[in-house]
Amino acid sequence: MDSLTDFYERIQPLQTSFASIVPFQAFSDKLLAMDFTAKNDIWRKEVVENVALFATTVNGVLRQAKAKYGIGGYLEHRNIYARSSVFDGTAPRRIHLGIDIWGREGTPVMAPLAGTVHSFAFNKAYGDYGATIILTHHIHELQFYSLYGHLALKSLSRVSEEQLIKRGENFAWLGVP
């Protein structure tokens, strides 16, 4: 596999076989696309540098929109990463490399596809993922990973490396950021 485009072309036809990652009723639950870029003035410095205030602000935005989940975008340029050096390697990283699902603490997290636990850890550095589980998936000779961060700590005590996780299995719970 040479590129993200190749990956997308191989995985896209399979998307209808994915299980929901969180409990979701398509006809009644509202999703809110959330903009975590610098263009959104709600993410002022004092908000993004205070985890509790950030969480309260996101929860307030969801409540106001009457949304069950907030969805953060893939490849979004996020200045929020500047608050921590965790993602600064040879150059600072500001591009979001995943899709966020923001919901109530304790919300069950399910595997979209069958897989195995690749690794799990509590990444405690400021601005890091907190309780994190990475699953390995294999589909038609295609191997890829899915990362679940900001989980409830109890999630880490319920998994082990190489543990098989079934499609749709509740293997973790959302935590706080």
Predicted ranges, named:
Residues I101, T132-L135, K166-P177:
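Short hydrophobic beta/alpha edge segments that flank linear recognition/processing sites
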Residues A111-S155:
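Zn2+-dependent peptidoglycan hydrolase active-site motif and core
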Residues M1-D100, R104:
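Polar/charged, compositionally biased leader and regulatory segments
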Residues G103, A152-V159:
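Short alpha-helix capping/helix-loop boundary micro-motifs
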Residues G72, L97, A114, Y129, ...:
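Short glycine-rich loop/turn motifs that provide flexible caps or phosphate-binding loops at active sites
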Residues H96-G98, R104-G106, P112, G130-T132:
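Extracellular structured ligand-interaction cores
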Residues P92-L97, A131, Q143-S146, I165-G168:
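Glycine-rich, flexible loop segments associated with nucleotide phosphate handling
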Residues P108-S119, R158-L174:
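Short, well-structured beta-strand-loop connectors
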